[in-house]
Amino acid sequence: MRTCRAATAGKLTAVLATLVLALAACGGGLSPRAWAASVCEALTPWRAEINKLTSSTQQQMTAQTTPAQAKENLVRLFAGAEDASETARRKIDQAGVPETEHGEEISARFQASLGKVRDAYGRARDTIDGLGTGEATAFYDGVRTAVETLNKEYDASALDTSRLDSEELRQAFDEVPECR
C-alpha cells in the first residue's frame, strides 16, 4: 500500500513539476498580436492628443497674444503632452511582456522611448515656465529655442518599430487592426 501511494505521489509531483516548468517557460506574457494591439491601443489616443497639442502650440506661436498669455497656454499644453506621454507609457507597462524572444527588452524599449518623450515635454514646459515675459522678442526667441530643443529630443527618442528584434512582433504590428 505504501509503495503504491509513494509511486502515485511521485508521479503527481513529476506532473506538477512539468506543468510549473511549462507555465514558467511561457512567461505569462501576451501573444505578439495581443501585445501589439495593446501597444497600439495605448499609442493611438496619445498620438491624437500630441497632434492636437502640436497644432495648438503652432497656433499659439502665431496668435496675437501677450507673452504672459502665451506662456500660460504653452506651459499648460506641454504639461498636457507630458501627462499624455506618461499615460501611454503606463498603459504599455500594464500590457506586460510579449511572448517572443527578447520580449522584456522590447517592452522596456517602448516604455523608455515614451519616458524620454515625457521628459522632453517636461523640460520644454519647465524652460518656458522659466522665461520672463517683460520683453516679447526675448520671450518668443526663448520659446522657439525650447521648441527646437523639444523637437530634437523628441526625434532622438523615437522607437523604430521596423527594427524590432522579433519577426512575430513586426508582423503583428503590420496586421492587427488597432495598429492601422
Report each predicted region and the residues it spans.
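C-terminal motif of bacterial Sec signal peptides marking the signal peptidase cleavage site
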Residues: 22-25
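Short, solvent-exposed, charged loop/turn and helix-capping segments
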Residues: 86-111, 123-135, 160
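A charged, solvent-exposed segment within the mature domains of Sec-exported extracytoplasmic proteins
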Residues: 121-180
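Immediate post-signal-peptide N-terminus of mature secreted/exported proteins
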Residues: 28-79, 175-179
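Amphipathic alpha-helical coiled-coil/heptad-repeat segments
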Residues: 46, 53, 57, 81-84, ...
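Bacterial N-terminal signal peptides that target proteins for export
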Residues: 2-16
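Short, charged, amphipathic alpha-helical segments
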Residues: 33, 37, 68-79, 104-111, ...
